[in-house]
Amino acid sequence: MDHFARVSLVAALLYTNTWAKTVRETLRITWEEGAPNGQQRELIYINGRFPGPNLVWDEDDDVEVTVINDMTQSVTVHWHGLDQRPIQPGDSFVHKFKAFPPGNHWYHSHQKMSLVDGLYGAVHVRPKGDRKGLWSQISQDDKDIEAMEKAACDPEYLVVSDWSQYTSDEYWKISNDSGLPVFCLDSILVNGKGEVYCPGQKFLQGELAPGVLDAFPPGTEVSDKGCFSPALDRIKGGPWNMTERPDLIPPHVETGCVASRHENETIVVDPGRNNGWVSMHIVAAATIAQIAISFDSHKFWLYEVDGNYVNPREYFSAIISAGETFSIMMKLDQEPGRYTVRIPNTGASQVFSAFAEMVYKGHEENDKKLGEARLSYGGVPTSPEIKNNSYFPWKLDTDHMSPWPPSTPRPGNADEEHLLVLGRVGSPNNHTMNAKYLYPLGFRDEEPLLFYPNATLGTENEGLLLRTRNASWVDLIMQVSTLAGDEVAFKHFIHKHGGKTWRIGFGTGVWNYSSVQEAIQARPNDFNLETPGFRDTWITAPSASGEKHWSVLRYYVDNPGPWLLHCHIELHLMGGMGMVIMDGVDAWPDQLPEQYRLGKRL
C-alpha cells in the first residue's frame, strides 16, 4: 500500500503543499485479552477495539495521527511512508502527512511480527476528482454512474486477516526452536470475527485444489487442520546443515484441531440506496494466507487494486494476497435475503476457510440462506464458468489489470537495473531479497537511515541497501528458485514502500541477460510496456518442481526517501526477506525538522 507515497518525510520538505483541512486522529494501542475466534489469547487493541478503527479522509487533507503506546513492548504504526524509531512503551508520536493518493489503503505494524497480534485497520481516502470514466465502463446509465460514485465514497469495509492462537513472539519461537517452517493457522477473520472449523481430515484432503498433491510424494496427506507437515522436503527445502526438532512444535499447532463457535461478520446492504449498487473495500491484513472471496449468486466488478484504479472487470471470485487491497462494485439484483460470503485460503499452505453473511436490508431476521456457492471450502471454483470468470494473481490476463486513467512506464532501457535473487539461505526460516543478505527487522532502529544515510557505506550492511538517483527510471529484476536448497519455492508477496511499480516482464528460466532491453528483444511475449499493471505488491511465481521464474518491475524515482522492499509474509520478513531502497538519495535534504525525530538521541 504505498498509500501516502508522495507525502513522505523527505518529500514533504521538497514540495509545497496546498492548503486543506486538518484532520486529527488518536490511536491508543493496548495489549489485552480477547477471543476473536472464540478462543482466548492476548492481542493488540486500538482505541479499545480489534481490528483498529477505519480511518476516512478526503484527498489532500492534512492528517495528524497521534499514536500512544500503552503496551509494554515497542511498536510502530506504519503508513507505508514514514521512517522512524519504534515508539517505546509509554511514549507517543504524531504522524503528519497529506491524505494522498485517493483510494483504499490500510495501516499496520512493522515492528517484529506484531501484525500477527492484530495491529491493523482500513484507510479510505475519498477522491476529489471525477471518476465518470471509470464507472461508465460498468454501466452507461447516468443514474448508475452517479450511484456508483456515491457508493464508492461510502463503502463497506472488509478487513480480512488470518489468525493463530499463538502470539507473534510465541509463533516465531516455535519456528525457530523446531528449525522448521511452521505456517499452520487457526482461523480467517473478517473485521475481527470468525470461528475455528474442524470438518475432519478426510474432508480437508478432498478439498485440496487440483494439482496440489502432484508436488508431493504419493500418499502425502494434510492434517486435521488442513496443513502439510513442515518436515516434508517440499516444504522445508534444503538439505540444510542444521538440526530439526519437530518434537518442539506444541500440540494443536499443526495437528489436533479444536473447534470453537463464535460470531461471523454480517454485512447489511441496502438495495434501495445508490440505485442498488454497493462498494466494498477489502484489506488483506493476512500474515501468510492467500485468500479468495466470493458472494453466493452475486458477481462484482473489481475496480481498484492497491489503492490504484484499474479498468474494471467483472468476476465471480477473486484471490487477494497478504498486503493487498481490492475495491469492488456490486449490483444488488438478486432475491432479497441472506447470502453467504465465502473466504477460503487458496494457497498450498493450508486448507481452511471463513464465512460471513451479506444480508439485504429488511431481512436481518430471516435465517434462510439463499444463493449458490461460487467457491468450495478449499477455494476451488464450483464450475468451469466460475473458474473462467475469476481473478487469479498467477494468470497474466487477469493479473495485469491496466491502470485507469492510463499510466505507462518509459519504454526501452531504464537508467538503473538491479538483479535481486530471492529465496531461502542456510535454513528453512532464513529468507533473503538479494542472494545472501538477511535483513534484521531491528536494522537501524536507533539510528534510522533517514537521519544517517551514509552510515552503512564501506560496511557489509551496504548489501542490505540499494541507492537510486532522483528522477531516474529503475528496473528491479527478481529471480526465484535458483538458490541452493530453495529450488522448490513458495510464492512471495513483494511489496515496495514509497511508490508503486509497473510489472513489465514475467517469465520462466534463469535471468541471464545483460539488460532488460536485451531480454525484451529475445522474449517479446514475456513483456508488456503498453498496458502493464501498476501497484505496490506483486506475487512471485511458486515453483512446485524446481522451475525458475523472474519478474521485472519498473518505476520512476520521484519520491525521495528510505523505503523498505520486502515480502509481506510475516515469517519471511522476520526471517530476513527485506532490504532498503534509498530512492533519490542525492535529493535528500541536509536538515530534517525536529518533529520528525523520536527521542533525544537522534
UniProtKB/Swiss-Prot annotation:
Pathway: Pigment biosynthesis. Its main location: other. InterPro entries: Cu-oxidase-like_N (IPR011707), Cu-oxidase_2nd (IPR001117), Cu-oxidase_C (IPR011706), Cu-oxidase_fam (IPR045087), Cu_oxidase_CS (IPR033138), Cu_oxidase_Cu_BS (IPR002355), Cupredoxin (IPR008972). Its cofactor is Cu cation. Residues 30-128, 157-345, 461-584 form the Plastocyanin-like domain. One of its GO terms (molecular function) is oxidoreductase activity. Cu cation 3 binds at H110, H497, H566. It comes from the Eukaryota. Residues 1-20 form the signal peptide. Pfam families: Cu-oxidase, Cu-oxidase_2, Cu-oxidase_3. This is Laccase 1. The gene is Mlac1.
